[in-house]
């Protein structure tokens, strides 16, 4: 029997918490750049990417439908560097997240090498649950 680790896929589905919690395995895989996904409440999320060595102008964020894509292309150094040890990775990357319906990007900030992307779920009133008042008289005349 084969076991498939879906956790890398599920971590990138923002707003599908019940599905992710039901299917997520304990296995974790690494990707570049490292990132966190925070949930403040049922309607507010934040994606934080660690981007040491990148500048704001090296980054591009695009939302196409429900696909949020973050791309980074670091500037090339003016002169070639001879490394004795290179522990910081500054390579081009493209990272995509699938957002649930009605999720919107409410803002993005880049501070101290961390890119924060804030997300908000905006449910239209037609989808939001409606409370129905119960009257004391029967609805149909009998």
From Swiss-Prot:
GO terms for cellular component: cytoplasm. GO terms for biological process: protein stabilization. It comes from the Bacteria. It is found in: Cytoplasm. Homodimer. Forms homomultimers of about 100-150 subunits at optimal growth temperatures. Conformation changes to oligomers at high temperatures or high ionic concentrations. The decrease in size of the multimers is accompanied by an increase in chaperone activity. HAMAP family: HSP20_IbpB. Keywords: Chaperone, Cytoplasm, Stress response. InterPro entries: A-crystallin/Hsp20_dom, ACD_IbpA/B, HSP20-like_chaperone, HSP20_IbpB. It comes from Citrobacter koseri (strain ATCC BAA-895 / CDC 4225-83 / SGSC4696). The N- and C-terminal flexible termini are involved in oligomerization and in the binding of non-native substrate proteins, and are essential for chaperone activity. The keyword Lyase does not apply. Its main location: cytoplasm. Pfam families: HSP20 (PF00011). The lineage of its organism: Bacteria, Pseudomonadati, Pseudomonadota, Gammaproteobacteria, Enterobacterales. Transmembrane segments: none annotated. NCBIfam families: PRK11597.1. This is Small heat shock protein IbpB. The keyword Protein biosynthesis does not apply. PROSITE patterns: SHSP. SUPFAM superfamilies: HSP20-like chaperones. Associates with aggregated proteins, together with IbpA, to stabilize and protect them from irreversible denaturation and extensive proteolysis during heat shock and oxidative stress. Aggregated proteins bound to the IbpAB complex are more efficiently refolded and reactivated by the ATP-dependent chaperone systems ClpB and DnaK/DnaJ/GrpE. Its activity is ATP-independent. Residues 26-137 form the sHSP domain. Belongs to the small heat shock protein (HSP20) family.
